[in-house]
Every structure is written in structure tokens, then in C-alpha cells.
């Protein structure tokens, strides 16, 4: 949620879900993204914020510098190609990450490299607003590479997954 016009000395938005930001520098008016789990303060940068749940919440920095904080932990300052995420106890953890999936997300693609099938299907289910049910639990942790356009239909993504010949995905309903 963000206003049509920012007022006062801060530019504040509230986020549930995921968003990519390309923020113009303005030292006198910091840009702040607030989620249920943390607050990100920037002066001018490119970054991605994901806030779906406590265990699926992180800030990934593409360019510039941001500070991430919450009530449970000291603030973390991120450099490009770093990510702040929440631990199970609500603390913040910083780690180096590959930013390519976030660039592709911004360009309209799902991009998974060495990602477990369960994570891929969770993301597809969220995007297409469908429930995903696994009948073969043995494949949940199978790691794979998969790329698909977010503008294509769910059927298109399913056909591409099935073309890999490793497992079979069906659509019901």
C-alpha cells in the first residue's frame, strides 16, 4: 500500500507479498518499506522485498545499499548481492545470494536454479492461485533448473515441467 503522493520527510510503503523497487536517491526523504516482519530503509537503490510469511520473508539487494531491521534484532546493512532473511526465532540473518532469479522475476520470469521441486510448485501455486498436492513425496526435494514466463498460462508451465520427463504434473478442476 502506498499513497498517491508522499508527504513529510519520509516515503513509506506497506507490503504484503513481493515487490521490486527502483528508488530514486533523495537523502532528505528516505524510502521505507514496512512489512509484518521487518522494515527496510533506503536512500536510492534497486532491491526486492518478499513478505509472504515469517519463514518466507527477505530483502535482496541488487544495487546500492539498504538497512533492514526489526524489533528482535540489530539492523543489518546490505551490500549488492546480499540478502537479509528471518530465522525461525525472528532474528535477521545476512547471506550472499545469486541475484539473477530476482532480475528475472522483475523481467516477468520464474527462474529456478538448483531449487527443490516443492519450492518451485509452491511458487507456481501462489502465482496461479491454485492448491498443489503431491502424490509422490519422494520427489519433493528433487533439485532442478526451471524457467517459465509469468505471462503464460499454468497449463504452459505444467507442459514444460512434464517435458523434462522426470515426474508428471496433472491439473484437476
Where are these regions (language model features)?
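A residue-level detector for the "anchor" residue at the start of short, highly conserved motifs
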Residues: 1-173
Amino acid at each position: 500500500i502506498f499513497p498517491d503522493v508522499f508527504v513529510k520527510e519520509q516515503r513509506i510503503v506497506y507490503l504484503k507479498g513481493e515487490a521490486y523497487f527502483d528508488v530514486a536517491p533523495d537523502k532528505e526523504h528516505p524510502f521505507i518499506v514496512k512489512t509484518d516482519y521487518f522494515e527496510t530503509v533506503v536512500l536510492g537503490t534497486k532491491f526486492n522485498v518478499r513478505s509472504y510469511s515469517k519463514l518466507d520473508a527477505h530483502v535482496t539487494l541488487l544495487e546500492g545499499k539498504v538497512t533492514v531491521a526489526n524489533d528482535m534484532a540489530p539492523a543489518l546493512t546490505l551490500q549488492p548481492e546480499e540478502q537479509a532473511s528471518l530465522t525461525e526465532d525472528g532474528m535477521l540473518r545476512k547471506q550472499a545470494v545469486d541475484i539473477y532469479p530476482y532480475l528475472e522475476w522483475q523481467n516477468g520470469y520464474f527462474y529456478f536454479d538448483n531449487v527443490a521441486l516443492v519450492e518451485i510448485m509452491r511458487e507456481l501455486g501462489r502465482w496461479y492461485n491454485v492448491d498443489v498436492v503431491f502424490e509422490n513425496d519422494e520427489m519433493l526435494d528433487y533439485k532442478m533448473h526451471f524457467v517459465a514466463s509469468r505471462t503464460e498460462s499454468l497449463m504452459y508451465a505444467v507442459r514444460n515441467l512434464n517435458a523434462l520427463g522426470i515426474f508428471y504434473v496433472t491439473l484437476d478442476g
